[in-house]
A protein has these predicted regions:
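Conserved "landmark" site that anchors the functional core of diverse proteins
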Residues: 1-130
Length: 130
């Protein structure tokens, strides 16, 4: 397969090495300002406390006092906390949340992120749904 890489005799899919995660705007994407939208182009460090429920990112956006009523979330939802940090919900994540849902990952992006560990860097690439 053309997308497989041979490394030390083991075959890996290219996604193991990717650090760019495609996301689409979430329902509350319009809550964030233009400065924070530009910050989404920066690299984000994955911090500790990651598990099958969620991944946490170090470089945050502006602190905020946004609140929404408890709303449904699905795997791949990226929520913005009041401190400006982001949480990416994974396969075993909760089913509802009260933080703004600013981004949404697709299945491939969830798989790429799930292969990352503490200290790894990722970048978001915002793609529009067609």
């Amino acid at each position: 397969k053309k997308n497989n890489l041979d490394f030390a005799g083991l075959m890996y899919t290219e996604s193991v090495f990717k650090s760019t995660i495609e996301v689409s705007p979430g329902p509350e994407f319009n809550f964030i300002n233009n400065k924070d939208i530009q910050l989404l182009d920066e690299e984000y460090f994955i911090v500790s406390s990651n598990n099958r429920m969620g991944y946490f990112f170090e470089n945050g956006l502006s602190p905020n006092n946004f609140s929404i009523i408890t709303s449904p979330v699905i795997p791949g939802t990226i929520q913005l906390t009041p401190s400006g940090n982001m949480i990416a919900l994974m396969k075993d994540g909760q089913v509802s949340g009260g933080y703004p849902r600013i981004l949404q990952m697709n299945e491939l992006s969830i798989s790429i992120l799930s292969q990352k560990k503490q200290g790894d860097k990722i970048k978001f690439k915002i793609v529009e749904l067609s």
